[in-house]
Curated annotation (Swiss-Prot):
It holds the Pfam family SelO. Its EC number is 2.7.7.-, 2.7.7.108. It comes from Xanthomonas campestris pv. campestris (strain B100). It is an enzyme of class 2 (transferase). This is Protein nucleotidyltransferase YdiU. Nucleotidyltransferase involved in the post-translational modification of proteins. It can catalyze the addition of adenosine monophosphate (AMP) or uridine monophosphate (UMP) to a protein, resulting in modifications known as AMPylation and UMPylation. The active site is at 270 (proton acceptor).
Amino acid sequence: MTHLQFDNRLRAQLPGDPEQGPRRREVLAAWSAVRPTPVAAPTLLAYSADVAQRLGLRAEDLASPQFAEVFGGNALYPGMQPWAVNYGGHQFGHWAGQLGDGRAISLGEAIGVDGGRYELQLKGAGPTPYSRGADGRAVLRSSIREFLCSEAMHYLGVPTTRALSLVGTGDAVVRDMFYDGHPRREPGAIVCRVAPSFIRFGNFELPAARGDVDLLRQWVDFTLARDFPDLPGSGEDRIAAWFGQVCERTAVMVAHWMRVGFVHGVMNTDNMSILGLTIDYGPYGWVDDYDPDWTPNTTDAQGRRYRFGTQPQVAYWNLGRLAQALSPLFGDAASLQAGLDQFRDTYLACDRRDTAAKLGLAECQDEDLHLIDDLRALMREAEMDMTLTFRGLVDLSPQQPDASVLREAFYDETKRAAQAPALGAWLQRYAARCLQDGASDAVRASRMRAANPRYVLRNYLAQQAIDQAEQGDLSGVHALLEVMQRPYDDQPRRESFAAKRPDWARDRAGCSMLSCSS
């Protein structure tokens, strides 16, 4: 028996669906009561010791058969009251109507050892009223990716939901990975996601689109009371201040994505958190050879709406949809524009901060924005690895700038040779700027190591771990989890995890591009 304590405020304070169970239906309430569907043989495959500790879970709790039963969807701890939440959203720029938690079921809101709130949510636990004809299950492949990325992003310093556990179900799930008419049976799994709140932009968009101002106001009042209790003011002013905070947090989150080279892949408004947390890890990826037009999502391959370089603009557009949803609560919605302006100001400030940090400078001058933009253009032309380029610059001597520090970063020798003169000229400019900055080599290197990770969860690394896990070997998952807990450190005997994408992975499924199939 664990010592978890639950208060489940969302279920207690927002109107629920009068019908229980997973029957697909239109729901006019905030949430629906639904239990996870049992699985054949739940087995704990991996867990986050840090998240477990925050929840007050002990080693004997994690080792007990009951833990796998609960987080595999077969049982409940006392105090758990499972539900699925109703929301809508804009998908690829178009209103999609009711969406909701199609395969995510929240078990409850636990109070952690720090007094904080931790909503525990199973992904892949079976059908809900929002499953839209799907089975509500998840495959091991996508579950490993979500589990590892949730934790990797946390240790990179990127605002994110967390993952407590990865449980194998013992059941097979049929999926058509690339929607090309070739479905196959894959092992099933369930991830327990953890966050103070899973409320999304779409929770406000759906009642607004339906003209249900009462439910919209209930969502806003609940969110302010539970998740933003310290916001001063009242009425429209308080809602506008809250929207400003959502805009600010979203800007900080996306700036971190751009700093570490992360591409979300599916920035629909139903995948946007009101806490500014990265949420819903599907066909995500990290930029290998630098390309601002790259997207890892096969569904977005033609339009590339959610490509790496447009993520800040998409976030701004999504916030505009949230502002539109909130506008019925305002006599004059013009006050919401201040929040959108706050997004721009915050993002630009974060970008300047990150530019200075990535280049190892004390502060960002206007010329430094041109300097880093010119480096990005060079990386694109020379097909250079983003992570290895910035990490390689740590070892540059401003007194004797030598391009050999970047030798690991190139994917194409012909392009390297063609761009060598331009790169040499850029290194001279950068070296002069470092000397002007005046910091010692040690100080500059320390700044850069704190901003430029050595290790990121490259798709090919995750795919290698998945291949092993599908054969029953979890060692790759455990090794990646361990390495990604120290992404900014040089880890002896772990150099292979920092290597650029190998040639075999350039076009392999799961290593270059992915679908939403999971």
